[in-house]
């Protein structure tokens, strides 16, 4: 619906608004390393604990994600599946499906 769309000036403004609305002192954010440093800084300034997992040639290290998610419930996963910044990695279809399955389990 139209009321569910928010137009912003750029990614930094969108990330800032997400932080203001969804991120707090006890928020756990999962992200790939390396990742967009401005976003990670914004999450940390909002009080989140950012946990990073290695990024491989075809997407994130799924074993590392499972190792984080099993003992630590995460609130959200900050990622870019197409042309990830700064690595320009493009996730494989297999990694996308694995992440979806993991999200549905948790």
Give short role names for the model-derived ranges.
Residues 1-106:
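Conserved core of the PLP fold type I
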């Amino acid at each position: 619906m139209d009321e569910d769309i928010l137009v912003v000036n750029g990614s930094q403004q969108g990330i800032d608004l997400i932080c203001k609305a969804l991120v707090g002192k006890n928020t756990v954010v999962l992200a790939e390393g390396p990742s967009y440093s401005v976003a990670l800084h914004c999450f940390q300034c909002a009080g989140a604990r950012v946990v990073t997992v290695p990024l491989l040639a075809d997407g994130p290290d799924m074993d590392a994600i499972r190792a984080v998610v099993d003992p630590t419930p995460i609130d959200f996963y900050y990622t870019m599946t197409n042309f990830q910044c700064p690595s320009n990695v493009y996730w494989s279809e297999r990694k996308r499906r694995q992440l979806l399955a993991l999200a549905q389990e948790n």
